[in-house]
């Protein structure tokens, strides 16, 4: 029995005639899909995990039941749904085709997108960076050779502005894969750790994070193994950082236990892949005979650089593959290629494990040659060239007005809590950096991730009250490993060259790992940590552990781990080894420039505040902002209002500021008004008649001011024409200065006229004196 052909969600049963019916684009039978859907219809399963003062709720079986695996993870009122789907037919690609997408919906925050179409368009930086964190947390646990298209989608259902959704998405991906039949050696658990007043806080709220000196995301595997680390910190001490990692790993184990309990209750059975793309042992054995000695000779020839070494290895590859094709004509091309890769990787790693030597002749803890240079181009606000081995990075600093900072719209602020940002680092990796040809298009995920890491490394040392927006660009000119950490070093040098008063210099380094694993237990038997890794060491190694900071502490960390998990001990040793190397790099950088320049360069931008009296503001701005627009167009300055009488003028160069200052002085100049005497009577010329009064000028180049109807005559009038006033007529007015509240000129014609009949009353006299009339005799006698 199986479900109706026409509707997979209904529960009517009817026999299928000719075998199982398959959905379009799917290669599994509908009968298999129905078992999962019918089971889900009986109700969802859920588990709650206590994390200190927080509770993590994990559920499955209610939403997205056609997916191979789905889960909803909730903390407070923030909820994320994650689905996992994997094809059952292999992909033609020769790698693990895993796609992770994290999407934020404006509806989750109760908002409507602010773009023209009022719908989600494109992908934000936050979505890309979160997708990368999720990918790095789950990718190492897929079986080797599992080349099947797999997609993990994370959909933000609701966000309360209190609990962050990114950690929930990592846990949701773990649950979805664990509850699916997709081969995956999970689960993993993830938590965020903050340090507030010296205490570690698990999954802190958004408000708590604003006062935290650490933002650490830890993804852990069973047996207290670490799979992924991502952190930004306010230059915290190494021991505090290590303690936070240990606390994070402890709480990840509680999440893992909750997921394992849910998997046990569900009774998940993993599918058996058609094929795992691993080379035949026989072909690998023959490759050993053909290439091992030649590869050993290349990897122990310390005269090679990146280019010559790659050429030598490729020559051996071509010769070996040709002989393997003759020996094994029936073998798949992938087996031939991968057999050589396996042997090359084994030879490379054994040299490090057994001989404690690296392919460029360094020992395990040595740095490559480091050289620095600043003030590369005089016209730039700041520039630096950082060279480490064959990795070369050019960094520049540009200043602009505060108005040029990144502005977050209301939706992004509601979802992520991200507000305006006046410091940014942009990383570029052109194809020529590795002697390749490629499209030079928009930003890709890798460039965004590397730039975000370098920005995290530098942000803590940037002064918060700096009067400019700072943009650091990092262009990789040559790449042979650890270009993101070279960007942090080069960015620090460029900032000091530009005169930004950073609190301390920043340096970064990458630590690699080579392990030897027990084939039966799957545990690490032996390992070597490598300081300042090359590109080939990153490719053939098990970890890329990037850490940046000052002489005092740590500002950023990112760990890309290729193993299904590493012990805490290795992570602690890597941090210690990186700290030693970081201080050594800082000593070299200090020889080039040890502290920020005391002043910015002569061609750098300047900011000045201008006082514009309220009386001159209308003239300064001009009708419809004409004068301001003209000023900005002609001089290139940016003007923003600070308060009612103060304007901030940003000029890209001092000469532009002088030009703008002259322009402003000319606009606001009014020498004749300074000669006006308070209480004096002047002749005014009527220039315009309005319903509310007349516009008059006291002198020719004066801006006409309004003489209100109430100040035209002692009598109450509704229109100036009632007094016979005309345009061009001259009248006498008295000058009373300017109103301190709104800056308007105060004039009056009424006070110059004889007083109208009024009654003056006194508190002592019961009688009244009528002004303008003769006093009667009776009244005089009574007095």
From Swiss-Prot:
Modified positions (Phosphoserine) in chain numbering: 754, 782
Any one cellular-component term (Gene Ontology): mitochondrial degradosome
All residue ranges annotated as the KH domain in the record: 605-664
Molecular function terms from GO: 3'-5'-RNA exonuclease activity; miRNA binding; poly(G) binding; poly(U) RNA binding; polyribonucleotide nucleotidyltransferase activity
N6-acetyllysine PTM positions: 250, 264, 285, 289
Domain spans labelled S1 motif: 679-750
Membrane-spanning parts: none
Subcellular location: Cytoplasm; Mitochondrion matrix; Mitochondrion intermembrane space
Database matches in Pfam families: KH_1, PNPase, RNase_PH, RNase_PH_C, S1
CDD domains on file: KH-I_PNPT1, RNase_PH_PNPase_1, RNase_PH_PNPase_2, S1_like
Assembly and binders: Homotrimer; in free form. Homooligomer. Component of the mitochondrial degradosome (mtEXO) complex which is a heteropentamer containing 2 copies of SUPV3L1 and 3 copies of PNPT1. As part of the mitochondrial degradosome complex, interacts with GRSF1 in an RNA-dependent manner; the interaction enhances the activity of the complex. Interacts with TCL1A; the interaction has no effect on PNPT1 exonuclease activity.
Protein family according to the UniProt entry: Belongs to the polyribonucleotide nucleotidyltransferase family.
Name of the protein: Polyribonucleotide nucleotidyltransferase 1, mitochondrial
Species for this entry: Pongo abelii (Sumatran orangutan)
Gene giving rise to this polypeptide: PNPT1
């Amino acid at each position: 029995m199986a479900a109706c052909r026409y509707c997979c969600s209904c529960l009517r049963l009817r026999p299928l005639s000719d075998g199982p019916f398959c959905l379009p684009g799917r290669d599994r039978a509908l009968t298999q899909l129905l078992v999962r859907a019918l089971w889900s219809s009986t109700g969802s399963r859920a588990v709650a995990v206590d994390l200190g003062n927080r509770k993590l709720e994990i559920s499955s079986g209610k939403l997205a039941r056609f997916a191979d695996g789905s889960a909803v993870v909730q903390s407070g009122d923030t909820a994320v749904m994650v689905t996992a789907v994997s094809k059952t037919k292999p992909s033609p690609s020769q790698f693990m085709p895993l796609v992770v997408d994290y999407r934020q919906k404006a509806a989750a925050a109760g908002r409507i997108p602010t773009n023209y179409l009022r719908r989600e368009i494109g992908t934000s930086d936050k979505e890309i960076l979160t997708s990368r964190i999720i990918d790095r947390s789950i990718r190492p646990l897929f079986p080797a050779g599992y080349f099947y298209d797999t997609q993990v989608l994370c959909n933000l259902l609701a966000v309360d502005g209190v609990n962050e959704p990114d950690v929930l998405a990592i846990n949701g991906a773990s649950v979805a894969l664990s509850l699916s039949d997709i081969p995956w050696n999970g689960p993993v658990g993830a938590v965020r750790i903050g340090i507030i007043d010296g205490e570690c806080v698990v999954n802190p709220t958004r408000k708590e994070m604003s006062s935290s000196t650490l933002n650490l995301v830890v993804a852990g595997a069973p047996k207290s193994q670490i799979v992924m680390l991502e952190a930004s910190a306010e230059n915290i001490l190494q021991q505090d950082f290590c303690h936070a990692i240990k606390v994070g790993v402890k709480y990840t184990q509680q999440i893992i236990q909750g997921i394992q309990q849910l998997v046990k209750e569900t009774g998940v059975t993993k599918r058996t892949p058609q094929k795992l793309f691993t080379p035949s042992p026989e072909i690998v054995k023959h490759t050993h005979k053909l290439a091992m000695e030649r590869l050993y000779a290349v990897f122990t020839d310390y005269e090679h650089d990146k280019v010559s070494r790659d050429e030598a290895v490729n020559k051996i590859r071509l010769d070996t593959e040709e002989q393997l094709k003759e020996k094994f004509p029936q073998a798949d091309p992938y087996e031939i290629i991968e057999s050589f890769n396996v042997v090359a990787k084994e030879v490379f790693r054994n040299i490090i494990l057994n001989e404690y030597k690296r392919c460029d002749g360094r020992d395990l803890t040595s740095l490559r040659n480091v050289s620095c240079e600043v003030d590369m181009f005089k016209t730039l606000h700041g520039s630096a060239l950082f060279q480490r081995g064959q990795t070369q990075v050019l960094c520049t600093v540009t200043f602009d007005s505060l108005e040029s900072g990144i502005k977050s719209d209301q939706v992004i602020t509601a979802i992520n809590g991200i507000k305006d940002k006046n410091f940014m680092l942009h990383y570029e990796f052109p194809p020529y950096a590795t002697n390749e040809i490629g499209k030079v298009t928009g930003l890709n995920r890798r460039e965004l991730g590397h730039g975000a890491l370098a920005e995290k490394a530098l942000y803590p040392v940037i002064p918060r009250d700096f009067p400019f927006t700072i943009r650091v660009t990092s262009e990789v000119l040559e790449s042979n490993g650890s270009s993101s950490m070279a960007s942090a070093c080069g960015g620090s040098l460029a900032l000091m060259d530009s005169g930004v008063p950073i609190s301390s210099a920043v340096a970064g380094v990458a630590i690699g790992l080579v392990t030897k694993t027990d084939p039966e237990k799957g545990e690490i038997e032996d390992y070597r940590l490598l300081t300042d890794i090359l590109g080939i060491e990153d490719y053939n190694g098990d970890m890329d552990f990037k850490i940046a900071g000052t002489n005092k502490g740590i500002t950023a960390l990112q760990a890309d781990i290729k193993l299904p998990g590493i012990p805490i001990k290795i992570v602690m040793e890597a941090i210690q080894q990186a700290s030693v190397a970081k201080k050594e790099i800082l000593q070299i950088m200090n020889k080039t420039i040890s502290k920020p320049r005391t002043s910015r360069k002569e061609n750098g931008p300047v900011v000045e505040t201008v006082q514009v009296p309220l009386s001159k503001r209308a003239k300064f701005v001009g009708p419809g902002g004409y004068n301001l627009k003209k000023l900005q167009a002609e001089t290139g300055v940016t003007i923003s209002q600070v308060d009612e009488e103060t304007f901030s003028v940003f000029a890209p160069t001092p000469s532009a500021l002088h030009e703008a200052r002259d322009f402003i002085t000319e606009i606001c100049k009014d020498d004749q008004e300074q000669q006006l005497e308070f209480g004096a009577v002047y002749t005014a010329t009527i220039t315009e008649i309005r319903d509310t009064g007349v516009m008059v000028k006291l002198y020719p180049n004066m801006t006409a001011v309004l003489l209100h109807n109430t100040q035209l005559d002692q009598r109450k009038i509704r229109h100036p024409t009632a007094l016979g006033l005309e345009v061009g007529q001259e009248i006498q007015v008295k000058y009373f200065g300017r109103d301190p509240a709104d800056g308007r000129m105060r004039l009056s014609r009424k006070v110059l006229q004889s007083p109208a009949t009024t009654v003056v009353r006194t508190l002592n006299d019961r009688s009244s004196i009528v002004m303008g009339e003769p006093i009667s005799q009776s009244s005089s006698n009574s007095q």
